[in-house]
């Protein structure tokens, strides 16, 4: 029995790095891109290459940006006194869709997960602490997910910032326990922000 070409194996292995994509899904995607949608494959490869080339992390909020400081952080209409901490860019996007928050953000790009080797240092919490204690921020709103890891992250951040005299609040549990902001409707997120509590 002959094995597939090594370039095909490499493509399938590369697609498996995506979240939720197992070997069968990766194989189906590879075959589809190569056989049915070569233009789409070329566009995907080009867009990914371009994004890797031009995107970096904003120096203030840690979100993806093409500039040293992203447009949101540079916007003088945003309230610099409140800093909302989220796990991922998708969480920030969901909060923005509610149109109920006008402060600034800090994107952790993950959450504490000791079993996966992600501790405070790996998450870069020292950058968050520096940002939250820069003199502009009056309140930090913790909007991490209501999962075990999200709760542990919120608790750790609250402890670190509270020890430095920073006012810390937590979004309300209008977001379902075990739920993730990315999969929550905007009305629920808006209510959770309005009904946040001290943490």
Swiss-Prot record:
Known function: May play a role in DNA repair. It seems to be involved in an RecBC-independent recombinational process of DNA repair. It may act with RecF and RecO.
HAMAP family xrefs: RecR
InterPro entries (UniProt xref): DNA_Rcmb_RecR, Rcmb_RecR, Rcmb_RecR_Znf, TOPRIM_dom, TOPRIM_RecR
Organism: Azoarcus sp. (strain BH72)
Name of the molecule in the record: Recombination protein RecR
NCBIfam families attached to this UniProt entry: recR
Family statement drawn from the similarity comment of this UniProt entry: Belongs to the RecR family.
Domain Toprim: residue ranges: 81-176
């Amino acid at each position: 029995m002959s094995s597939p070409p090594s370039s095909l194996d490499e493509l399938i292995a590369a697609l498996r790095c995506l979240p939720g994509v197992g070997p069968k899904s990766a194989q189906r995607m590879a075959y589809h891109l190569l056989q049915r949608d070569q233009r789409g494959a070329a566009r995907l490869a080009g867009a990914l290459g371009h994004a890797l080339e031009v995107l970096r992390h904003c120096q203030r909020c840690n979100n993806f940006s093409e500039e040293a400081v992203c447009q949101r952080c540079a916007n003088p209409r945003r309230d610099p006194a409140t800093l909302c901490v989220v796990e991922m860019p998708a969480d920030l996007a969901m909060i923005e869709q509610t149109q109920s928050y006008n402060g600034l953000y800090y994107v952790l790009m993950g959450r504490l997960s000791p079993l996966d080797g992600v501790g405070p240092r790996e998450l870069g919490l020292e950058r968050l602490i520096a940002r939250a204690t820069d003199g502009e921020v009056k309140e930090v709103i913790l909007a991490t997910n209501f999962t075990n890891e999200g709760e542990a992250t919120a608790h750790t951040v609250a402890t670190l910032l509270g020890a430095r005299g920073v006012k810390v609040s937590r979004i309300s549990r209008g977001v379902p326990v075990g739920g993730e902001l990315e999969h929550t409707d905007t009305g629920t997120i808006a209510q959770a922000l309005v009904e946040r509590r001290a943490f």
